[in-house]
């Protein structure tokens, strides 16, 4: 008796990792494919982390999902990150694109338009008062600032120690280490003056906070990019039309608003994505 693989679906299958932003991006990709191709799209969201999504791609259980270039480079491709100051987003993207094609026959689509990286965040009234837009600008003022960080950021090799060295940052006392969920409350309550967060966190938008630009490119690039199996693109070339339509269309502010709508307002990701697409002429 010959063992047969399960039949492939007659329609594209879009996956996602297991957090809100990923479900939103998976839904965005699915809706855009449906709108531009009139294909039926199956959703398989919340598939745990990058490794599970990659295995699902290789097995043909999903045809596409959205990944982040720095994660793809280190977690999937097992490549070392360039040294701080040499982490050009285009160079990282080119390496990821080349190796995914060589190793896995997976196409890396055009970036959606935003990074989800670490971010140093301050209150907007402080940003205006001190005229701060970049971390380089902030270095002169950090001796008067109290810092709040999550446990991981304090320990990571690409976290606080390296960041402080790259920018010459000194703070008013040791950092206050706390659960990530408490950082924004501490910042709003003036218990700290700067926090280490993530660029697409919903509270940044909800509380009108300011992200200081990483102008020396210390943090690795984590551009959001769609990954699609070559076989799926050959079978449904209309998918490429959807990828091209989404290229550069999602800003970090857009992502914060959508994340906050789902997490903070408990709205359905599909509804949030439909509103985003309508507002942006997609």
Residue ranges and their predicted role:
Residues 9-21, 39-45, 143-148:
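Short, well-ordered beta-strand elements
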Residues 50-56, 61-66, 228:
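The structured alpha-helical core of multi-pass membrane proteins
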